[in-house]
Amino acid sequence: MDYHDPYFFGYVLGFIHLLGTGAAIHALLTVRTSQGAIAWAMPLLFIPYFTLLPYLVFGRSSFDAYIKARRQANQEMRIAIGDLNWRPWMEEAVAARRSEAYAALRAMPKLGNMPALANNKVKLLINGEETFGAIFQAIREAKKTILVQFFIIHDDKLGRELQSLLLEKAAEGVAIFVLYDRIGSHALPGAYIDKLRDGGVQIKAFATRGGWLNRFQINFRNHRKIVVVDGLKGYIGGHNVGDEYMGLKPPLAPWRDTHVQVIGPVVACLQESFAEDWFWATRELPPLSLPDEFPEDGVLCQLLTSGPADAQETCSLFFVEAIHAAEERVWITSPYFIPDEAVTAALTLAVLRGVDVRLLLPSRPDHYVVYAASSLYAFDAVRAGVRVFRYEPGFLHQKVVLVDNEITAIGSANLDNRSFRLNFELMLLTVDSDFSSQVESMLTADFNLAREISVQESHETRRLHQLGMRVARLISPIL
């Protein structure tokens, strides 16, 4: 091949543009939203030299082959669970449907394919010390099984404390299963994993698919955080395993996050969620445990799982339904605010209904492009009448929804496109006035430490900053 041929580079450029055109067509056919399709297709058509590789890494969001494989694995898992006659919540589900609180959930049980269950005990854990203090104490008391799932596990002080506890319990004969996300925990060294494995802990990485090409695919991250001990106690929320979640790493310290401890029949749903992801990673079921008895009364709870293999966009629909359900107030906290059109419309309509609509966002960025895009969406929300606050003391990472005086949701889902369509997420919904009152007190304290964004501020942003935010928003559908 003559690289000095004057036509050579023309052929190369033409070939790249041909590939870009093919990728643009693929984006138009497969990306779920029109905004995302356009955000990919235009650059692929006009500047494919810079966008083909990012599309290979970040794009292909529908990823049909993966979705089919995941759905098939989920079906196989349900068949395997059916063979175990695993139906632990029948009485609690009937009791839930008969309760007055059940009507507050409306579409949620069908949306999440998990039943609403009565008779649960829930405890709010409002920082890293409370969360990991409770989790580690439960692990120390474990007798039979421990299920652990996190998006991020670091080999630092907190990570090594978890490792030490798990090795100690494995030596006592407790069956331990650990699942981590391969992308979120990309910095986790092999020595950390090997030490757990050598000590008798079963540990696996959650990955999208096998194959050389899919090594470049970093979408479809498993963002869920689950700990279940002996089928008795479950933990769900926003914390990962790392010193930053304990507020030990400036400049984001102190870290603001929230977890929930739950005891009762909904813990069986947490185990099913873990089993679904574990089955995908191993094609085996972990042991599923039930207590001898459930609490006789307590809180109505529902676990809402969501992911890219769902038949509908479960996470986005959850936020839309929660906002539409609000009659007096809807307060939402999230580290990121990149809503789709449906969520934006729901927030606007809630304001027009006279609902007290508040958003609590961080004042410090952990991802600058996402923060810039979030800022522009926040300004739009303020101009629509939404009260938007920025948490001042440190980084806000909690994912909490409070609707009126009964409904709460706490878990892993952010108010952004990635949680809506790309990540595997998990939220715990509760219907209980006493627990909602606790969440209200927690959020009120957070709002008191926050600065409200004014309409004037949204108009006074410098032109250069506005340009940066608009560029960030342009690519926000693919973030």
Curated annotation (Swiss-Prot):
Q: A Gene Ontology biological process annotation?
A: cardiolipin biosynthetic process
Family, as annotated: Belongs to the phospholipase D family. Cardiolipin synthase subfamily. ClsA sub-subfamily.
Protein name as annotated: Cardiolipin synthase A
Q: Per its UniProt record, what CDD domains does this chain match? A: PLDc_PaCLS_like_1
Q: What are the TM regions of this chain, as residue ranges?
A: 8-28, 38-58
Its source organism is Pseudomonas syringae pv. syringae (strain B728a)
* HAMAP family, alphabetized: Cardiolipin_synth_ClsA
Cellular compartments annotated: Cell inner membrane
Instruction: Identify the Pfam families for this entry.
Output: PLDc_2, PLDc_N
The record's section on NCBIfam families has: bac_cardiolipin
GO molecular-function term, one example from the UniProt record:
cardiolipin synthase activity
The protein's role, per its UniProt record: Catalyzes the reversible phosphatidyl group transfer from one phosphatidylglycerol molecule to another to form cardiolipin (CL) (diphosphatidylglycerol) and glycerol.
